[in-house]
Structures are given as C-alpha cells and as structure tokens.
Regions:
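Conserved PLP-enzyme active-site core in the AAT-like
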Residues: 2-315, 320-336, 344-352
Length: 354
C-alpha cells in the first residue's frame, strides 16, 4: 500500500529520493533460495572483484549499513585509542553524525578551517603538531569529503598534495565518499584517479544518496592502513547477516554505468538550477539572492532572506545551511526533473517579489 504522495518533490536532500529501478531489480535478482550469510555470498564476492577493477588490485571492500557506520568503522580501524582525526569544521563526521566518532569509538576530532569546503596542507598543518607529546591526542588521520559538504569537488592534484603532506607526517588519509559518484561525474575521471592513485588510504564509499536503498561500504586502498576492521565492523553493529542484499545494491551502481549516469543527472539538474537562477538575476527578475560556493556536484548553496526561505519551505522542502548568514542548501537527485527546477525557480522569484 502506498501511503505517500509520489508527486511530492523537494530539494532538501538526495536521501529524500527513492531507489533506482536498476537497484530494485538487483535486490529482486539476489532474492530467492539460500546464500551464505555475513558476506560469504556470491554477490559480495562479485562486489569485491568489481571494487578491485575500479580501485586497484589491492582494494578490499567491507559493506555496511550507513555512512556514519562506514566512517566510524573506517576511522577506528586506522588508529589506536590515543589517535585523533584532523577534519574540516564542516565535515560530516563533526557536524552531522551525532557525536558517533567520539561516543562510539572515543576518537578525538581536531577541526580546521576550510576553503570552499576543502582542506589544504596549510590548513591541516595548524593541527598537525604535538607528535610524541603524551598530553595531546596524537594526530594520525586526516579525513576529507568528496564531494565536499558544500558541493565542491577536490581535483586529483589537490588530493595528491594533501596525501603527500599527510604521509610526510606519518599520518593516513581517509576520504568520506558519501557522494563519490557525484564527484566522479563532475571530474569525468575513473574512481582510482582521485582515490587510489591520489594517495587515499581508506575510503567510505556511499551509495544511498545515489539511488540505493541503504548500502554503503568501506574500501581499504592501503592494506597497511587498517587493523582489526572485521571485528570493528561487527562490534559497531555494521555487519549485515544477509549481506548479499547490501552488496547487490552497490554492485548494481557499477554495472552499465548506472551510478555514474544517475550522479551525472543529479549534477546536471543542480547546474540547471543555478544557471536558471543566474539568468533570472541577470534579467532583474530575481534580486537579493547570491551564491555561496561554486556548484560542482549536485548541491546549490545560496544566500537568501530567511523569512523568504521559510515561506518557500511551506511549499518546497529544503534546509537552512548556515542561519547566521542566511545560507540555504538545495540538493538535486537522480530523479529531479527540469520541470521541478523551473517550478522551484518560479516559486523563488514569486516569494522574493512578494
């Protein structure tokens, strides 16, 4: 029984969208009969082979339920109890995971300022000190997000520069890839070019935001970077007994460019939203709206009067990003349509002129 109005659309989150038809088909195909549990199934084996094809021969995959779980298990496996993570002040692990890294694993997070959502060797250096000082939690991992929390995308060169600096300090580089497909679509590059070959040690690979039902994974690119990850996944309650259904979802995104096609569409819709707004601004039809960051993936960040935003939100759902400066976030998904964009821009124009 369908309980919701399937015509209802929003720009709050790519998590609001449904499931890609190909992913639903993959779940159905994995159903029926018996398969070994806890990852000893043919779908998880096939996913491992696919991951190695895309990320290199040493890559190893560990499917989990959600992004917070992927980040917590990955980071915990990368350091001892006295370790600390350096991350952006806007990092998901710092702002949107309910304190899970600290509460579940006891990790210390050192936050640093960001430039358009990105870390640089210079910003990391502000917390990369005190090595060997027993009074200071030891910086051992740097975590970056690709694409970033504000919709920008690291280039391979930027990641390589970070990795070189991080490794020179005997630290490791973790990438939160909740929207990795959107980054790949934006860059037009194979995954390995901005992960494995750029010096990333461990990756949290997202799928849910790109059309999966509920599937993420930890991808270990440097086998020497983790310890005890199998046990940590279990004790962190991220080990699925019927893992074939998790693995099948991620596998479906890699087959026949399903994931890249979906992410490309979401990115294209975000670019259309921005360009349509820019056209209205140039025509003088929209005023008092400005953009916060470049639109490089599937999110548009804008500055708008919050009273106007609140009125808009009565008709179309979206989130405030930084209320202190009147910043909002508009996210596009694999199923966002051009009609959705035009209708939303018309509403923005109408409310700004009210």
């Amino acid at each position: 029984v369908t309980l919701h109005d399937a015509r209802w659309r929003g720009f709050a989150s790519d998590n609001y969208s449904g499931i890609l038809p190909e992913v639903l088909d993959a779940i159905r195909a994995a159903n029926g009969g018996h398969q070994s549990s806890y990852g000893a199934d043919v779908y998880t084996q096939a996913l491992g082979e696919t991951i190695r094809e895309h990320f290199g021969p040493h890559a190893e995959v560990f499917p989990v339920f959600n992004g917070t779980g992927a980040n917590v298990v990955a980071l915990t496996s990368m350091m001892p109890r006295w370790g600390a993570v350096i991350c952006s002040s806007s990092a998901h692990i710092h702002t949107d995971e309910g304190g899970a890294p600290e509460r579940v694993s006891g990790l210390k997070l050192y936050t640093v300022s960001h430039e358009g959502g990105k870390l640089t060797p210079a910003s990391v250096a502000t917390q990369a000190y005190g090595f060997g000082d027993e009074h200071r939690a030891q910086p051992m991992v740097v975590s970056i997000t690709q694409s970033t929390e504000v919709g920008t995308v690291y280039t391979p060169g930027e990641i390589r520069a970070l990795a070189d600096y991080v490794h020179s300090k005997n630290m490791l580089l973790h990438m939160d890839g909740a929207r990795l497909w959107n980054a790949a679509a934006s860059l037009g590059l194979p995954f390995a070019d901005f992960t494995t070959h750029a010096g990333v040690d461990v990756l949290s690979l997202g799928a849910t935001k790109n059309g999966a039902l509920g599937a993420e994974a930890i991808v270990v690119l440097n086998p020497d970077a983790v310890e005890g990850i199998l046990y940590l996944r279990k004790l962190s309650m991220q080990l699925s007994s019927k893992m074939r259904f998790v693995s099948a979802q991620i596998l479906a995104l890699f087959q026949e460019s399903v994931g890249i096609t979906a992410a490309t569409h979401a990115n294209t819709m975000a670019a259309l939203l921005r360009s349509t707004l820019e056209d209205r601004i140039a025509q003088g039809a929209i005023t008092e709206l400005a953009f916060s960051y470049p639109t490089q993936s599937n999110g548009v960040f804008a500055m708008i009067d919050l009273e106007v935003a609140n009125r808009l939100r009565q008709k179309v759902r979206f989130y405030n990003w930084d209320e202190s400066r009147g910043e909002v976030r508009w996210m596009c998904s694999f199923d966002t349509t051009e009609a959705d964009i035009i209708s939303f821009v018309d509403l923005i124009q109408e409310e700004l002129q009210a």
